[in-house]
Amino acid sequence: MDVFVWRLGDQGAAGTPAVDHIQNFATAAAGTNATGGDVLDLRDLLLGESVGPSNGAGNLADYLHFEVSGSDTLVHVSHTGGFAADAHAVGAGYTAAQETQQIILEGVNLQSLYSGATTDQQLITQLLNNNKLIVD
């Protein structure tokens, strides 16, 4: 299991995000066994985020937007919650001028992995429930 950590200050400026590529992101649920999956740790990067009841998405869709491009998943991040006015549908438009970090999961299609997840909120909830995402 690998934990990929982003800290406040790692991000780029709004509209010119820092871009990180992750290869071989293990998609198994994290914490289930010694060969559990990898984890994205954004708790120090995101400012003012909250998780909803029962590991719900809370306001995290204001911070995270997901897009599938070929066989990759692009995680667009606004560390200050700048996506609040967006539609929050996977692959829909988002406020690129607010993006400060982009995480590319190479060879991973999260929408296919979590079949039926068509909104950012649904993907976030799946990631939280599978211990794949750490936030405050």
Feature annotation, model-predicted:
Residues 61-136:
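Low-complexity acidic/polar repeat-biased segments
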